[in-house]
């Protein structure tokens, strides 16, 4: 019923819309502040830039009518892998994982994230990270993602 594939260059900007939908739902479920609409344009430009540099790729699931119904992105970054690490290493970030509501519970997020992790590994990343909503946590745990020692405190 579904197929997965890489996005085309023309579809990269559509991924910013899916990112906005994901972020909006995180506001509803987890209280994460909903991004302002102007942020979508900034994210579009960022996605195009990083895609053109070869640092960002998206996998999408399409339905039988060739409509994009789910996506997941992979972003390569150089970062310190842990506090006080002497050298930076390649890290993969899984970003903008989103499935349209009427296509959920079909394993699409799992499949797309798994495919993105393979791409990140092929690009040289030693570890993949992501920020998860409470509703998506189980999918990522099933893929082998673990909680890290990150803590936060609102200061306002």
What are the roles of these predicted feature ranges?
Residues 23-46:
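Conserved GNAT-fold acetyl-CoA-binding loop/helix
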Residues 60, 67-76, 93, 98:
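Conserved beta-strand in the GNAT
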Residues 113, 120-132:
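Conserved GNAT acetyl-CoA-binding A-motif
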Residues 1-13:
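Conserved N-terminal entry element of GNAT/NAT acetyltransferase domains
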Residues 128-139, 154-156:
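Conserved beta-strand-loop-alpha-helix junction that forms the acyl-donor binding cleft
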Residues 103-115:
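Conserved acetyl-CoA pyrophosphate-binding loop and the N-cap/start of the following alpha-helix
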Residues 45-60, 93:
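A short helix-loop-beta-strand connector motif used in the catalytic cores of GNAT acetyltransferases and
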Residues 84-101, 152:
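Conserved acetyl-CoA binding element of GNAT-fold acetyltransferases
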């Amino acid at each position: 019923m579904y197929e997965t594939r890489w996005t085309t260059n023309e579809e990269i900007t559509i991924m910013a819309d899916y990112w906005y939908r994901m972020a909006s739902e995180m506001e509803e479920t987890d209280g994460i502040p909903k991004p302002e609409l102007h942020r979508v344009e900034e994210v579009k430009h960022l996605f195009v830039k990083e895609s053109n540099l070869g640092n960002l790729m998206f996998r999408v699931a399409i339905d039988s009518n060739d409509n994009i119904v789910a996506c997941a992105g992979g972003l390569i970054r150089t970062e310190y892998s842990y506090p006080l690490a002497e050298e930076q290493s390649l890290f993969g970030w899984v970003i903008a994982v989103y499935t349209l509501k009427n296509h959920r519970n079909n394993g699409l997020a799992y499949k797309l994230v798994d495919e993105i992790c393979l791409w990140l590994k092929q690009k040289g990343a030693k570890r993949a990270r992501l920020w998860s909503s409470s509703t998506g946590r189980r999918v990522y745990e099933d893929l082998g993602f673990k909680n890290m020692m990150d803590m936060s405190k609102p200061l306002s």
